């Protein structure tokens, strides 16, 4: 099994490359000329996308071909103060540059919209805003000329009336979501409400790929064993153009601490690989969700090189052969 590692949003090594520079609503309101305010937002968004391109070039130098882009590329997007703003036209050139570089170097990029995207809410306004956010990500991907399928990982949402009711509300709500947006979605288990079994119920029923978060699973599960569950997870990816992906982080202290450590516990990851087996999939993409970002990836590669069952094949990929 070949394992490709990626990391999230920004580099700890590359200086002055934040992809999420912003402007507050208060700052925007102080600009007397509304159009001038929008132009300033566009300049910030262009800077963010320029830094995204710098990050992808940094990744190329380290043979990292899997990366999660920041969802905060365009400040004040979908805010009432910027209603009607055609931001995607203003940043078209920058979006295209990012997409061309990613495609040229066969990089997989995706997003993880924030926790305000809730698709199982009974409140129509929350659902409307959630779909607005998905449409924003869709526009970014289309501007990059990247296939939008399975590029946005989401959590199921809240459980105000219980887990079962939350799952059924998700199914009901997705019936009215445009196919173009629904096809973007991957679903991830969380550490508070919905276990991997719950997420699989939706993934199998709605044909949505399921992303296993190992750390979340360790914190919240019905059965900690993944031997039976893993093949069901893999099956949800059968119709996807992308390899199976999982999320990897380590607890700050203790096995069930939901807080993320700066780095990754290699022993826990190796134990997971032995549990699912070397023949589980041919290719596995692993998104590292550690506070030290790319530095955590580099350290994990060093740590994994010490295991007999691991063969390092690039600066960001290994082969697992127990």
UniProtKB/Swiss-Prot annotation:
Write down the top EC class of this protein: hydrolase
Known HAMAP family for this protein?
UV_endonuclease (MF_00606)
What is known about what this protein does? Component in a DNA repair pathway. Removal of UV LIGHT damaged nucleotides. Recognizes pyrimidine dimers and cleave a phosphodiester bond immediately 5' to the lesion.
Family according to the record: Belongs to the uve1/UvsE family.
The scientific name of the source species is Halalkalibacterium halodurans (strain ATCC BAA-125 / DSM 18197 / FERM 7344 / JCM 9153 / C-125)
Molecular function GO terms recorded: endonuclease activity
The processes (GO biological process) annotated in the record are: nucleotide-excision repair; pyrimidine dimer repair; response to UV
One Pfam family here: UvdE
Q: Say yes or no: keyword Nuclease present.
A: yes
Q: What is this protein called?
A: UV DNA damage endonuclease
**Which PANTHER family does the protein's record reference?**
UV-DAMAGE ENDONUCLEASE
InterPro entries per the record? Answer: UvdE, UvdE_bac, Xyl_isomerase-like_sf
Spell out the NCBIfam families in the cross-references: uvde
Known EC number(s)? 3.-.-.-
Lineage of the species this protein comes from: Bacteria, Bacillati, Bacillota, Bacilli, Bacillales
Keywords of this entry? DNA damage, DNA excision, DNA repair, Endonuclease, Hydrolase, Nuclease
């Amino acid at each position: 099994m070949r394992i490709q590692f990626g990391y999230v949003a920004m580099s700890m090594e590359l200086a002055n490359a934040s992809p999420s520079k912003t402007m507050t609503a208060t700052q925007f309101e102080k600009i007397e000329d509304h159009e001038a305010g929008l132009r300033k937002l566009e300049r910030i968004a262009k800077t963010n996308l320029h830094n995204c391109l710098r990050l992808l070039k940094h990744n190329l130098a380290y043979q990292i071909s899997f990366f999660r882009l920041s969802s905060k590329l365009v400040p004040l997007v979908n805010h009432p103060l910027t209603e009607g703003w055609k931001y995607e036209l203003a940043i078209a050139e920058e979006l295209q540059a990012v997409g061309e570089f990613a495609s040229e170097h066969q990089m997989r990029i995706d997003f993880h919209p924030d926790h305000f995207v809730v698709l199982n809410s009974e409140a129509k306004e929350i659902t409307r805003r959630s779909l607005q956010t998905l449409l924003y990500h869709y526009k970014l991907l289309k501007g990059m000329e990247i296939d939008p399928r399975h590029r946005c990982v989401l959590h199921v949402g809240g459980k105000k009336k219980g887990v079962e009711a939350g799952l059924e509300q998700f199914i009901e709500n997705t019936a009215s979501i445009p196919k173009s947006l629904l096809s973007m979605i991957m679903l991830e288990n969380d550490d508070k409400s919905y276990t991997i079994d719950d997420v699989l119920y939706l993934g199998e029923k709605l044909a949505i790929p399921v992303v296993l978060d190992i750390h979340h699973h360790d914190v919240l599960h019905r059965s900690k064993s993944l031997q039976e569950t893993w093949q069901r997870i893999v099956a949800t990816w059968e119709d996807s153009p992308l390899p199976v992906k999982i999320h990897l982080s380590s607890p700050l202290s203790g096995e069930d601490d939901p807080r993320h450590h700066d780095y990754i516990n290699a022993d826990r990851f190796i134990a997971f690989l032995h549990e699912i087996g070397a023949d589980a999939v041919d290719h596995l993409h692993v998104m590292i969700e550690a506070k030290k970002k790319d530095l955590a990836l580099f350290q994990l590669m060093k740590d994994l090189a010490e295991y007999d069952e691991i063969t390092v094949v690039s600066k960001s990929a290994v082969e697992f052969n127990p």
